[in-house]
Amino acid sequence: MFSQKIKCKVFADLHQQDDVFLIPNPWDIGSAKVLQGLGFKALATTSSGLAYTLGRADGEVTLEEKLFHCSELAANTTIPINADFENGFADDPETVAHNVLKVANTGIAGCSIEDFSRDALSLYDLDRKSVV
């Protein structure tokens, strides 16, 4: 099993290469293993895919469920995983930062934070985004 440190290095290197790389979205361990077997260099979680496998709409997955999902994918693959971490499961930058530390501890190599508020379904203002 590759360490998280190695996966993070591989993921950073992918972003520095001259060529583009595709990063498909597995929704469970099985699809992650298939995509890894097809030769993809990295994977990214899908918030909607996870929600649908749980019989819910996109945006209805809890932080705890997302953390478990990320840890399962990271533990069952040897390539970097980037987490679709929605809005960081919080509206304030401090809680987002705390939650990013939690997801980092699952073994993933990176995460993406969206710039929208779940309640208002609108974009955060620029001042708030720049703090994060």
Language-model features: locations:
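Glycine-rich, proline-tolerant flexible connector loops at the mouths of alpha/beta enzymes
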Residues: 42-67, 87-93, 111-128
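N-terminal amphipathic alpha-helix/helix-capping segment at the start of soluble metabolic enzymes
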Residues: 1-25, 29-37
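Catalytic cores of alpha/beta
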Residues: 31-34, 89-102
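Short, well-ordered coil/turn segments that N-cap beta-strands
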Residues: 18-21, 40-41, 77-81, 108-109
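Conserved, mostly hydrophobic/aromatic
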Residues: 28, 35, 73, 84, ...
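Conserved small/polar residues in nucleotide/adenosyl-binding loops
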Residues: 131-132
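Glycine-rich beta-to-alpha transition loops that act as phosphate-gripper elements at the mouths
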Residues: 24-27, 79-93
